[in-house]
């Protein structure tokens, strides 16, 4: 498997390139982004630690969902909305993530299994709500679609050492505000910078794992950046963290 980083691959929107150009050269922050194949199982997740141990003053890791997870979540949302049974797919995906949690946190010191189980309890509740919902279901659908990043970010945080090892976790929906744009989702930079500054002042992180793909609207409703949006997330957070470098890793 290759461990060579690819700087802003083809999947990144053109807007991401302009954001990187705006990064200040004097920053001492490095952002790493890992896609679904790089967090596909416990072995690959554990292999990330030496890649991000790069000597930067601030290290940021943006993660996608485990390989195949988003496709499964999209299918479950469609099944729920159309009145079909989604329980088998939910159980299988839950067990895959719990098994990975057990491999990473076998002694339970990070409380990883319980945290991931809560994510899937929330997914089940969202699917039940979606099955009976009327009107605008877009926020519910977005919550379902983004569950994979919530869980994978927990897995990666624990594998890197967890809070005891200095690694914090940021749910991007806490700070990243977006709106519909002419070429897809656009960033509300004013709102995002304000929320990010507040979060950073409280946390003062030197190492943080961030959920890719997910965001929120100004009214707090959950949304996403669209398929393959985690590269876009990485570019956005490189800007917010004033990073000197963004590395997008593939197939590690």
Regions inferred by a protein language model and the residue ranges of each:
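Nucleotide/pyrophosphate-binding catalytic subdomain
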Residues: 1-252
